[in-house]
Regions:
Chain A
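A generic local secondary-structure boundary/capping motif
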Residues: 19-20, 29-30, 107, 118-124, ...
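Extreme N-terminal cap/leader segments of soluble proteins
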Residues: 1-58, 77, 86, 108-109, ...
Length: 317, 317
């Protein structure tokens, strides 16, 4: 049983949804019209033993991550967070002080990103902690960026540096400490001279998430290994074998960076520059969908490798 | 560690929420303004071994209940469901066929109540199933009914019959098979001659949920044991001791009926009548908060018992 198979079953059944569903399942956020407003919604689970290790992580960082990874979805739509509701299922022996620290961290993180927690549900059981965060967002006049829309010839760009998000470097562990790219996503979506054709956040690894973009847009992509911006964590992992650098940059999950495609002329305005705190790198090009693999990698020696689904399917791991 | 203590910590911290949070934590649904719309949101968890027993329940009924118990919150606000997102954490050995049946049941139930599932998240782990359903609703011109607003002299009313929701009677098991009181809640909220002063849905048992209403409204309530509408399930449980009838009607959880208070003149229009498929019963009266227990029960012999917190705290059981 693979989570992607289950998800695709849900997406396939999106046919026949009522008109008020503006963005059906399959994007970083879904959207529904309520009154005159388009309301974007995403839901993410943070499970002890799956997405986080409570034995090895401070409770404050767990609470923080529960919110920031949901906000990464909002960033990917170029939208603004409006509020969140949080459900928690806690082991009975979790401890009240620890529970309070957890909720304080969740609330403070959410407020810091202007995303107040305005509802929730708490249950207790004899199994590991599971947090479920639902975030609501609005476009406030800017159309959300979807996964579909990439066109042949588009530059494939990413923010920040990729790979090795689990590796602590000088006290910073990216998958716990990252800043969701809300300001960058918003600036890209709002800026006519740079507005991407499509966008996604990198949670499963560039190989897999770029493949999602390609499939949604019915195109393919070629990535240049030499152009990948590699994180310090990935450098640490590949210290004994630099040829592994691109594997970590393409395959590791939980970068929580943005990946987008943009026309070549727009790309010229932003590639190599900082957009609201994040440096944009061009890593490849959108090519025609010829029925082959969605994502291909051009290695330094010029050979081209198919790399669909190299990414880390972290939710089901 | 009690879930109510944790919840009250979250509610207390609602002070200082931004203006766009219309309904802070503590009601059946919270609400936030997005654009020009007020968006109501509730989140509920359905955990195997806590809220449902997967070994003893068909997967279709599990999927159904995940949606209907969330819709009961919408009914309690007198609002209209707009859509839902569903997060599922499934044991790795759950089985694909069973997972598909579960999602089909969730989707079909949601669609039947005009509440399309437009997003979700799936994870897998080595622990029991946990479903988390977030429902969005709108007022569509009708102000939502809150828990606060009960006034001294109000009639305390309920819909349907109470207690014994776990007991199968002629193939009907209320906690699995109930219809959320969406049409009744809406008719009450929308009807000026009958609009309640406050409303809640009965998930933790009348004693506890009425106490929530009283605390939110800073009043108390007196309930007449003789006036309680008792379900067939509760009758079955109290067959050997009819004095236990009121205990089941007041204390058992998961009725998913509506409890509301309404001025005496408005009550005359609806008590003993059917409102959109649900018979309304008057079970008591709102009295002043004199610092004593929030809810008191007048027994058939005229004695009065305090019964705060008799209800079933099902989420933490």
């Amino acid at each position: 049983m693979r989570e992607l198979d289950l998800l695709s079953r849900i997406y396939d059944s999106a046919v026949g949804l009522p008109d008020r569903v503006d963005i059906p399942p399959g994007d970083d956020m879904g959207a529904v019209r309520i009154g005159d407003s388009r309301v974007l919604v995403s839901v993410d689970q943070l499970a002890d033993t799956v997405h986080v290790d409570l034995d090895a992580t401070s409770i404050e960082k767990v609470g923080r991550k529960a919110i920031t990874r949901s906000l990464s979805d909002v960033a990917a739509m170029g939208s603004l967070p409006c509020g969140a509701v949080v459900a928690a299922c806690l082991p009975r022996d979790f401890g009240e002080e620890r529970a309070n620290s957890l909720f304080d961290a969740i609330r403070c993180t959410a407020e810091a990103y202007n995303c107040p927690v305005f509802g929730g549900d708490i249950a207790m059981w004899d199994h590991p902690m599971l947090l479920t965060v639902t975030v609501l967002a609005g476009g406030d006049g800017i159309a959300p960026l979807l996964r579909c829309g990439a066109r042949v010839g588009d530059a494939v760009c990413v923010t920040g540096r990729l790979g090795g998000s689990q590796v602590p470097v000088d006290g910073y562990t990216h998958h716990l400490d990252f800043e969701p790219r809300l300001a960058t996503g918003r600036a890209l979506a709002a800026g006519k001279p740079v507005r991407p054709n499509c966008m996604i956040d990198l949670s499963d690894g560039l190989a897999q998430d770029l493949a999602h973009l390609c499939r949604a847009s019915v195109v393919a992509a070629i990535v240049d290994a030499d152009d990948l911006p590699v994180s310090r964590g990935a450098h640490a992992l590949a210290a004994d074998d630099p040829t592994k650098l691109w594997q970590h940059a393409m395959g590791d999950g939980e970068d929580y960076e943005l990946c987008f495609t943009v026309t070549a002329d727009k790309a010229a305005h932003i590639v190599g520059r900082e957009v609201q705190g994040a440096v944009v790198s061009r890593v490849g090009t959108i090519i025609e969908n010829d029925g082959g693999p969605s994502v291909r990698l051009r290695l330094p020696d010029g050979t081209i490798q198919p790399i669909d689904r190299l990414g880390w399917e972290h939710r089901g791991k």
